[in-house]
A protein has these predicted regions:
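Conserved alpha-helical scaffold flanking the Walker A/P-loop in AAA+ ATPase domains
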Residues: 27-30, 83-103
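P-loop (Walker A) phosphate-binding loop of NTP-binding proteins
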Residues: 43, 77, 145
Length: 175
């Protein structure tokens, strides 16, 4: 299928779930095709999460979603090792980020330590747990949503994390 027809088909599928945000949908698709991670910022209840899930379905990507809150731990994102008594050894239990599309919902509600757990996966395409690196599946994409800074329970994302996102700001999400 020709590139423009494929893009139109993907956008058509996403529009079945997200209505009235054509400019934002086009920007998100361009960011995905460019291989970038995406940050969607807007007030609660305008469809940021629905949009991210619609893209994962339209692109047939295996996705995981974490609703970030202050009690989410870095190991929820990266995974952890656990002793397997039957096997007599430690075994890696994959975290939520080991998927094709990771939806980091309300990322700016998590602690800085948990937010930082995403950095290695976003920058290097792997997570390291107990000194062992585990590659993330390819393609790999993070779509993060956040509420505006200053909203109750939110904090600013560090510059080192912001640098890894293509930001689609709140003005364009409000159409």
């Amino acid at each position: 299928m020709e590139g423009s027809k494929l893009a139109a088909a993907i956008l058509g599928e996403v529009r079945r779930a997200v209505v009235g945000k054509d400019e934002v949908l086009a920007k998100v698709l361009l960011a995905i095709l460019a291989g970038g991670h995406i940050l969607l910022e807007d007030i609660p209840g305008v469809g940021k999460t629905t949009m991210a899930l619609a893209f994962s379905k339209a692109l047939s990507l295996r996705y995981n979603r974490v609703q970030f809150t202050p009690d989410v731990m870095p190991s929820d994102i990266t995974g952890f090792t656990l002793y397997n008594k039957e096997a007599g050894r430690m075994e890696y239990q994959p975290g939520a980020v080991l998927c094709n599309l990771f939806l980091a919902d309300e990322l700016n509600r998590a602690t800085s330590r948990t937010q930082s757990a995403l950095l290695e996966a976003m920058e290097e395409g792997q997570v390291t747990v107990d000194g062992v690196s585990h590659p993330v599946p390819q393609p790999f994409l993070v779509i993060a949503t956040q509420n505006p800074a200053g909203a109750s329970g939110t904090q600013l994302l560090p510059d080192s994390q912001m640098d890894r996102f293509m930001e689609i700001g709140r003005a364009s999400c409000r159409e």
